[in-house]
Each structure stands twice: as structure tokens, then as C-alpha cells.
């Protein structure tokens, strides 16, 4: 990081911050903010709890997973071969590649199915940045995966909800082209989302009167009690 940047680089970082600033009250870290705020705790504790949620790779750390998945892909196959890319994506779903989690990172969203509107904005700008940075081949690979992944997931899953590239799919690519280290991706997300967390905390303070205490149903199958002497 030299401190020098082009107008396009500044525009994309600004866009990424705006798109990550708020995304409703149901996402994990913002819901955490509501829950912790309802206990009556202070602002610092509520934001610290939200940060703990955002740190998770299924939430704020997802774009790091995307970048590392693509690094593994480039080290494992000929990424100019569409069949090889399709095979790698299938291997991901079969838990045979990368971290063997059975996921194609950056594809699919808990809310969006047809498209993530944030991803669409980043995708268009990422193309311009790739041209400026000489990263057209890498952008083409991302575009190929964005096209192939929904088709491969549809073939693999019996119950299928439409999927598409999400905001994490392109944000990691943009940060990488901006020469930002992976260790800063989640802190940048936090810098933006603290705006949303703060707004939701104020909403909870002004409108709620009771502690949030949802009912809980265990997801683990019921097991018969086994006396200690028989264990």
C-alpha cells in the first residue's frame, strides 16, 4: 500500500464500503447487536459482540474464503479449460477439494436466489478495475465460475433454490486488485457495517422494552438416557 490510488480505485473502495454498511436486521452480526443490546449492556459490548459474529468465515470472512478458493483452483487445475473448472467445482461440492466443506464460496445467499443486487454493482466495476490493473484473465475466471456454479449446484442438489454470485464473490477480488492484504478484508467490512450496527442498536434502545429471548428447539436427535454405570 503506497498511499497512491486512481479515481477508479477510490470509487470502488467507496462503493464497497457503502454496499457493506447495512443489510437489514436479520444478518448474523446485526441480529447479534439487537440481542445483546436488549440485555441492557453498553455500546462497546454490543459492537464487540457484533464483531465476534462478523469474524466468522460464514459471515464477514466469506470473501477471504473466496479468494483462497480461487488460489487453490489456480494451483490445482488448468483454469483456461472450462471442463477442468467444472470438474473442480463439482469436487468442491463433493468435499474433495479445497477445505472439503462442500461449498462453492461466494455462490448463494440466505435471502437472495435470482441475484444479489450488491454483487451486480461490484461485478460491473470489477470488470473496469481488472482492465485497469491487467487482471482480465482472473476476472474472466471469476465470470466463468459465476456462470458454471449455479448449473453444477442445480445438478447436485435434490432440493434446489436458485443461487447466484453474492457480494462476497466479487468484494474479495476487488480488494485483491487493490493490493489489500486478506487480513484487512474483515476489518474493512466492520468499518462499513458499524454504521448499520449503530443504527440497529439505536432502534432497539428506542423501541424495545424486553430482552430478546427466542424459544429454542434442539437440532440434535433425542437420545435415550444411559446410566453412568452403563456408559
Regions found by a protein language model. Give the residues of each.
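Non-transmembrane, aqueous-exposed alpha-helical and coiled segments at domain scale
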Residues: 1-231
